[in-house]
């Protein structure tokens, strides 16, 4: 061993990343586009999610994000629900579903 070496080997490991896609149906059409923009802005402050996109496709909100901890999408689903409640003032009976979780 050379000076400064402790005799241990360190293995660098990369965390798995997940791309999660969620959809919220039942959003009133007149608030969908503004809601998508507001939710996107809300997620800009959540640095634990990367490559966030939130769009209104004319009938539903679609949220996509990547992170290294949410292998089943439930954490993002919970945060999406909170953001919808905070960003869309009009009450509605919507439904959030996990469309996909992909390991990157």
Where are these regions (language model features)?
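Charged interaction segments
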Residues: 69-104
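Short amphipathic alpha-helix segments
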Residues: 29-48
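Broad gene-expression machinery/nucleic-acid interaction feature
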Residues: 17-21, 62, 93, 98
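Short, extreme N-terminal segment that most often corresponds to the first beta-strand
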Residues: 2-35
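A short, terminal or domain-edge coil/loop segment
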Residues: 28, 48-51, 102-104
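Short amphipathic beta-strand starts and helix->beta connectors
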Residues: 2-7, 44-51
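A structural detector for beta-sheet-dominated domains
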Residues: 23-25, 57, 64-66, 99-104
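Short, intrinsically disordered low-complexity segments
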Residues: 48-82
């Amino acid at each position: 061993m050379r000076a400064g070496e402790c005799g241990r080997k360190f293995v660098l490991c990369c965390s798995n990343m997940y791309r999660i896609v969620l959809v919220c149906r039942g959003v009133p059409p007149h608030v969908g586009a503004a809601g998508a923009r507001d939710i996107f802005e809300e997620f800009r402050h959540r640095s634990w999610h990367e490559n966030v996109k939130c769009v209104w496709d004319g009938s539903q909100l679609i949220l996509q994000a990547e992170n290294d901890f949410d292998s089943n999408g439930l954490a993002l689903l919970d945060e999406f629900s909170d953001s919808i409640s905070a960003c869309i003032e009009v009450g509605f009976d919507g439904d959030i579903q996990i469309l996909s979780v992909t390991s990157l």
